[in-house]
Amino acid sequence: MVATTSSGGSSVGWPSRLSGVRLHLVTGKGGTGKSTIAAALALTLAAGGRKVLLVEVEGRQGIAQLFDVPPLPYQELKIATAERGGQVNALAIDIEAAFLEYLDMFYNLGIAGRAMRRIGAVEFATTIAPGLRDVLLTGKIKETVVRLDKNKLPVYDAIVVDAPPTGRIARFLDVTKAVSDLAKGGPVHAQSEGVVKLLHSNQTAIHLVTLLEALPVQETLEAIEELAQMELPIGSVIVNRNIPAHLEPQDLAKAAEGEVDADSVRAGLLTAGVKLPDADFAGLLTETIQHATRITARAEIAQQLDALQVPRLELPTVSDGVDLGSLYELSESLAQQGVR
């Protein structure tokens, strides 16, 4: 189940400029739920009859697990139907297959490329040239963005990428440096120029998933600063796993200082027909103080995000573990905040 929430900070919501974006890259510190949020975002963007591609680049088969489908092959398959007739397809990019596709596309090495795979040359090439891996991944992503159907219209209305975590996202997107380390010209260089242009355009937005905890927020702040220095477009910060405050602001402030009106609490319980033993009642008061302290600390951390002046979305806690149903609930929460 998904709980209602308030983080204590003011949520800016989804600005209209993001509604025209076609490439959404979702990153976040490990453990913040970035894969879950990427999946929910894809469902939201697909609502209303749109067609969205959800891309995985780290080989973990996380998309398959989230949508409860078999492991994904290296091809685009429908995995979900969105609200009002939309469709979400998924692609788990296999780096070796992408390399062979690249060799066949630019060098006509179809048969030779397959032979390279059999002798392990593909794995060898991507290992000794780490930048090549990111060039191939971003190149494939760009191809899905620009691909047209027989009517010369984009095949997909939007592409959502479950991108590498914040600690690696800048390097992953720094295609210019990766290519300069690999080639000064030729097909690799030419293709990468198109990737760079797309990543720095208003067609792209990078969304950072975080929790209202010190380490995730600090890593988010550092990643935003690094991405801004690279002049890459920041879309939003998505605060995941918020918890409800339950208390009015004035009561919350007092409880955080250890002040709880025990008589009022007991009277309220009795009015509701609840009578607790003294030990249980004392435990309830202790939990109230602990909860208020936690909410207050989260609100203080949220102030660091306020200072960014970056659009912020807030998502509630999924209490019983993430399943397909909770993905749709999170998607609805995003839609209520203007995501479209």
UniProtKB/Swiss-Prot annotation:
Family: Belongs to the arsA ATPase family. BagA/BagB subfamily.
Enzyme Commission numbers on file: 3.6.1.-
Activity regulation, short description: The ATPase activity of the BagAB complex is not stimulated by antimonite, an arsenite substitute, suggesting that BagAB is not a transporter for this family of elements.
Record bears the keyword RNA-binding: no
GO molecular function: ATP binding; ATP hydrolysis activity
Name of the protein described by the UniProt record: ATPase BagA
Gene Ontology CC annotation, any one: plasma membrane
SUPFAM superfamilies: P-loop containing nucleoside triphosphate hydrolases
